From Swiss-Prot:
GO terms under biological process: DNA-templated transcription initiation
Record motif Polymerase core binding, residues: 60-73
Keyword tRNA processing: no
Induction: Up-regulated in the presence of xylan.
Residues of the DNA-binding region: 202-221
Family: Belongs to the sigma-70 factor family. SigI subfamily.
One Pfam family recorded for the sequence: Sigma70_r2
Protein location: Cytoplasm
Name of the protein described by the UniProt record: RNA polymerase sigma factor SigI5
Role noted for this protein: Sigma factors are initiation factors that promote the attachment of RNA polymerase to specific initiation sites and are then released. This sigma factor is involved in regulation of cellulosomal genes via an external polysaccharide-sensing mechanism.
Species name: Acetivibrio thermocellus (strain ATCC 27405 / DSM 1237 / JCM 9322 / NBRC 103400 / NCIMB 10682 / NRRL B-4536 / VPI 7372)
Length: 245
């Protein structure tokens, strides 16, 4: 998420235009630009900062964020990216992910789960950090997919950290839920009602699939998770979930 002060008072110029001037040789403007955008950098870095007592500005994370912002200025190409701030956000996040890979004391590619959800002590975090997921975490798209999925779950009052608890233990039950979710997503009326009103229309659903209302209610959370997955192009995340479930 971009910081609210995305446009600073440079006579009405956008960050992208400022960076173009800097790249044309205005080094003094570069120093002022970085200083003015420290709140923007802090906003991104804070998502990765797990300490509750330490000073963020004295942390390694902050230093990495500053270096990444400078790197973004040096590498930005207006012909490839129209928005400098979006490009800078991507570079900072990538560098933070690289940092947590390298500093993991147990050799896993572990990223602080607070980046996706405020609750750290969960079974799902254990499952994620105990798997070898280097290939998936190498993809910035995976991080974006996971974060987006988490936000969509929260809109239903669900948490990504409880995902393993939502899943039925038996394979046949999981397959049944998959079938139900597919039917819901395929039916525009039922699915629109689920997205807007946050409930499943059992009367309408019973017309297209033979399932008991209690079964749907018992597995409501998992069915909603599946509906979100089927409705979105989470290629990396779906591949990763196969390793968990």
């Amino acid at each position: 998420m971009l910081f609210v002060s995305a446009i600073i008072d440079y006579a009405g110029e956008t960050a992208t235009h400022i960076v173009e001037k800097i790249k044309n040789g205005d080094k003094h403007l570069k120093e002022k630009f970085i200083k003015d955008y420290i709140p923007f950098i802090l906003n991104i870095v804070s998502s990765f900062y797990s300490s509750k007592t330490g000073d963020l500005k004295s942390s390694d994370e902050y230093s990495i964020g500053l270096m990444a912002f400078n790197e973004a200025i040096e590498k930005f190409d207006v012909n490839k990216s129209k928005s400098f701030l979006k490009f800078a956000e991507m570079v900072i996040k990538k560098r933070m992910i690289d940092y947590f890979r390298k500093t993991s004391s147990i050799g896993r590619k572990e990223i602080p789960f607070s980046y996706f959800n405020s609750n750290n002590e969960t079974e799902f975090r254990k499952k994620i950090n105990n798997l070898d997921i280097e290939e998936e975490f190498n993809s910035y798209e995976f991080i974006c997919e996971l974060r987006d999925f988490s936000k969509k779950l929260e809109s239903f009052g669900l948490s990504i950290n409880n995902l393993p608890d939502y899943m039925p233990k038996h394979k046949d039950s999981r397959e049944m839920c998959i079938n139900i979710a597919k039917k819901i997503v395929e039916n525009k009326s039922i699915f629109d009602k689920l997205k807007t009103k946050k409930y499943i229309q059992m009367k309408e659903l019973s017309k297209i699939i033979d399932v008991h209302p209690k079964t749907v209610e018992r597995n409501r959370a998992f069915i909603i998770c599946l509906c979100i997955l089927f409705d979105n192009d989470y290629g990396n995340f779906k591949s990763y979930l196969n390793k968990i479930f």
